[in-house]
């Protein structure tokens, strides 16, 4: 078995993914079948956010990936220019 | 058929089924709660695929077998190699 921080980080990732999965499943799949007067609807945002938030997160992810690639390319270009 | 073509076919078929059902082009009268579940379905599948990937990565990180002895042996071998190469004149 892995030790120390590896285990903590790994189990943390598993826990985070389970939390996100259960909340999102309840939001998208279960909530439409629950009576709209039930108190549980208080814990969930309006349904439009169920698509808007993952979409925004995906776009942010693409932005960061693009920025990282740009940074790496610029750095390698500067290195080759210095050695020329 | 290549794997890419298979995946694209599968996505195209599922996508067109979903589009046909959500726009009501087939003329089916689904109950309102089913329609409510149907339209965010692609986003839901993407998010669950992401969660599965994240969870699998985390689980494999947590259960990866460390080899303490091999790690120590490797570190000492690296020190040995560095000393040897430095002696032969290679500058780090």
From Swiss-Prot, chain B:
Its main location: endoplasmic reticulum. The chain crosses the membrane at residues 8-28, 37-57. Keywords: Endoplasmic reticulum, Membrane, Transmembrane, Transmembrane helix. It is found in: Endoplasmic reticulum membrane. Pfam families: DPM3. Signal peptide: none annotated. It is a multi-pass membrane protein. GO terms for cellular component: dolichol-phosphate-mannose synthase complex; endoplasmic reticulum membrane. It comes from the Eukaryota. GO terms for molecular function: enzyme activator activity. InterPro entries: DPM3. GO terms for biological process: dolichol metabolic process; GPI anchor biosynthetic process; protein glycosylation; regulation of protein stability. Pathway: Protein modification; protein glycosylation. Component of the dolichol-phosphate mannose (DPM) synthase complex composed of DPM1, DPM2 and DPM3; within the complex, associates with DPM1 via its C-terminal domain and with DPM2 via its N-terminal portion. This interaction stabilizes DPM1 protein. Belongs to the DPM3 family. Stabilizer subunit of the dolichol-phosphate mannose (DPM) synthase complex; tethers catalytic subunit DPM1 to the endoplasmic reticulum. This is Dolichol-phosphate mannosyltransferase subunit 3. It comes from Pongo abelii (Sumatran orangutan). The lineage of its organism: Eukaryota, Metazoa, Chordata, Craniata, Vertebrata.
